[in-house]
Amino acid sequence: MSGVTGERPFSDIVTSIRYWVIHSITIPMLFIAGWLFVSTGLAYDVFGTPRPDEYFTQERQELPIIQDRFEAKNQITEFNK
């Protein structure tokens, strides 16, 4: 059972001038916003990941791998010292 949904066909939307005026501005702005989000370091702060120079400290040069899931909180505290 097929019917008409009343929506505009995709070919009409993509070939309209209005579509390209709007998207020629918004799509590049999304890329620029993403680039700024990462390049300024805000992504590290928002998601809580260490910056590339913070993975290893002078005191700890080994990989911070959690060995026991029941003692994970204590191990993470040790890694952060």
UniProtKB/Swiss-Prot annotation:
One of its GO terms (cellular component) is photosystem II reaction center. The chain crosses the membrane at residues 21-35. Keywords: Electron transport, Heme, Iron, Membrane, Metal-binding, Photosynthesis, Photosystem II, Thylakoid, Transmembrane, Transmembrane helix, Transport. With its partner (PsbF) binds heme. PSII binds additional chlorophylls, carotenoids and specific lipids. It is found in: Cellular thylakoid membrane. One of its GO terms (biological process) is photosynthetic electron transport chain. Disulfide bonds: none annotated. Its cofactor is heme b. The keyword Iron applies. It is a single-pass membrane protein. GO terms for molecular function: electron transfer activity; heme binding; iron ion binding. Heme binds at residue 23. Gene3D superfamilies: Photosystem II cytochrome b559, alpha subunit (1.20.5.860). This b-type cytochrome is tightly associated with the reaction center of photosystem II (PSII). PSII is a light-driven water:plastoquinone oxidoreductase that uses light energy to abstract electrons from H(2)O, generating O(2) and a proton gradient subsequently used for ATP formation. It consists of a core antenna complex that captures photons, and an electron transfer chain that converts photonic excitation into a charge separation. Belongs to the PsbE/PsbF family. Heterodimer of an alpha subunit and a beta subunit. PSII is composed of 1 copy each of membrane proteins PsbA, PsbB, PsbC, PsbD, PsbE, PsbF, PsbH, PsbI, PsbJ, PsbK, PsbL, PsbM, PsbT, PsbX, PsbY, PsbZ, Psb30/Ycf12, peripheral proteins PsbO, CyanoQ (PsbQ), PsbU, PsbV and a large number of cofactors. It forms dimeric complexes. PANTHER family: CYTOCHROME B559 SUBUNIT BETA-RELATED. This is Cytochrome b559 subunit alpha.
